Amino acid sequence: MINLASYSYPKGLHLLKSWQAGTEEAKAEIKSVFDAAIAGDFDENFSVLAPADEVHSTASVHMLALAILNDIYGVSSAEYYKTDPYRYVRANLTVGRLLGVKKLYMTWALYAFSCEVLGQKMMYPDKFPPGSDPDEALINKENCFELETPDFSAG
């Protein structure tokens, strides 16, 4: 069984760098890591609290997780963001650990999901995060003054 802790900084970062460089060895190794992650083998690691005497920060890692899953499994953008929440969370947290992040955060394409729920037509490119379709804007110069506050009590 793979131990995610053995990929602590900088080893995880080196693996990601080698994968991005396109080495077959790194692709095979990262596939093994993500096979274990998706199976839930790292869930206990994800529950480890970060040290309280340090300042923690991270960036949005969901796009890197998408790139990895697309490369090793062929997962499309729409599949990644809309079908399997366990895979989504585990892939994101694994990328965080590989980058050396001690305090894990969940990130997602909030800007896109917020629009889609309101009726915006979205584009889900194969390897990239979603975005609104610029040819079919939900809000335009003809309707921008007609906007009303959504009824949040209606569910």
Regions found by a protein language model. Give the residues of each.
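Catalytic cores of TIM-barrel enzymes
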Residues: 1-155
